[in-house]
Amino acid sequence: MTERLEAEGSRRGNNSKWDDKSDHDDVTKIYVNYSLSGIESIRFDYVKSGKPKDGPFRGQSYNTYTHTFEINHLKYEHLESVEGYYTEDTGIEALQFKTNLRISEPIGYHHDGCTKFILAVEGKKIIGFHGSSFALRVGSLGAYFTWDTPTIIKAVGGKVGTKWDDGVNQAGFTKIHVRSGQKGIQFIKLEYVDKDGNLTDGPIHGSIYRRGSPHVFEFKHDEEYLVSVEGYYEGDEECEVIQGLQFRTNIKTSELMGSNTGKKFKLTASGMKIVGFHGYAEKNLSSLGAYLTPLTPKKSECKGITDGSNVWNWDDGAFEGIRKVSVFFTALRIRCLMINYEDAGKVVKRSHGLNNNDHQEEKFVVDYPNEFITSVVGTMSSSSVMPLIFKTSKGRTSKQFGDYSFDDSVEFVLESKGCAIVGFHGWHNPVSGYMTALGAYYYPMPLPPAAEKLEAQGGAGGAPWDDGSNFQGVRKIYIGTGEVGIVSIKFLYENDVHEIVVGDHHGNKNLLRHEEFDLDYPSEYLTSVEGSYDVVPGSEEYEVIIMLKFTTNKRTSPCYGLDDDPIFVLHKEGHKIVGFHGKSSNMLHKLGIHVLPISNS
């Protein structure tokens, strides 16, 4: 439902009223013509039913400055609010626009005699404007708001059973309960915190009246959110059943709940988080779909002095990333902060403070998009912020900018787990120019890529197994050998929270002795596996693995098993091995790998 906020501004009698109406999907571009006297004309472009719609200029202008502000609705950006200043005599003097991702520069000029106004409705976006104009002035401005509807990914799988929909009232998930059985996922149940902050148990979707394997995935809703679901489904058309599910947050990945048989699917979208689920269920979970909303930057509080008549506020808003930070400082003060931001392929420069020739300049260049600033360490006193140190996602640390601390100085850190700093805001003294306070905007860093599964090599016999891909690397390999070659294998992994994970034995579990290949983890990692396979006594007509040899970034292992020339290589250029899968009985029939890109850090 559309909500109209009345126009704010001058009520002069000869105002000419105008109305762009509310039948639009989004605002896409704003043009503002302004002078020292105020905002003289304004124009809004929209998108309607997926097609662009250019609006007319409202007001008249002559010999003005022009500012444009583009909103990328294709990247789920939308206009949330407008802040402005006006007087009764001159109308709108200054404007600033805020989207769910960033803030425009202040447009125009205002003074102490102006009245401030804000056009905003919590949880809604602007889809149209109305207002009035007179004599080379925009007199007033109002807006139309509507709910920002989530993106829907349709349910994947069958349509057997009852259609269910948990909606989008969740502020964050806390637990996901899944039970798997021989015929697939039996049920799914979600626990979450609603938008009022209440812990809520969602209903069970599926059946609880059979035996199965329970799985629970728990996470902290205040810092963790769901970014994707991978799964498998199989069955006749319209009667498919979900066979396995795996959930991924911005911090960690769940185990595979169920099996990886059938067709693979993925519920995800770049730059978005999952806020709800829907699907079909009866005796089993037939299908699963999701609701998603855009991830939004989080604004920190300012550290330092933020009140008093001698300090002014500044706010850059949030961008895609930071390319360079220049700090101008003397022995006692940081006088100016200059930041080069990344904005859709363009560099946007912002400067705050007093930039003259009586100070030292130091620069810190970031290798964007491969590197992000993740934290700022500084000290604050009763009069200023000084010194500053910047740290990045690659583990780099800048030099210390400034070296003097006052007796009352207190250290502070601007940092949010799993996030990059994508913007700054703060306060400075307009006379001396020195910084008095600093804050940041945080945005989730791009997720590390999901591991790629390379096809297993070997014979056709045995039962399938998969250690999974939720690891950072391989620490140790146990190889069981016999007269016929490789009869068993086991791997020791390390996960993303530095826990050691012991994989299952694959092959003959009764061997008393194994050969071992130790890696100097984390500096050493697996890059390839060579092997061969053949029919041997006891394997019937099936081929089994008879030789394996492992190569790391530092060395090559001995040849395990029979002395045979390799007939296959498991390898992908620029990648490391982080997991294994294959087939086995009382012998090893087949071996495959999961790989991740090698990080330069």
UniProtKB/Swiss-Prot annotation:
InterPro entries: Jacalin-like_lectin_dom, Jacalin-like_lectin_dom_plant, Jacalin-like_lectin_dom_sf. Keywords: Lectin, Repeat. SUPFAM superfamilies: Mannose-binding lectins. The keyword 4Fe-4S does not apply. The gene is JAL48. Residues 2-147, 150-294, 297-444, 451-597 form the Jacalin-type lectin domain. Residues 1-21 are annotated as: Disordered. This is Jacalin-related lectin 48.
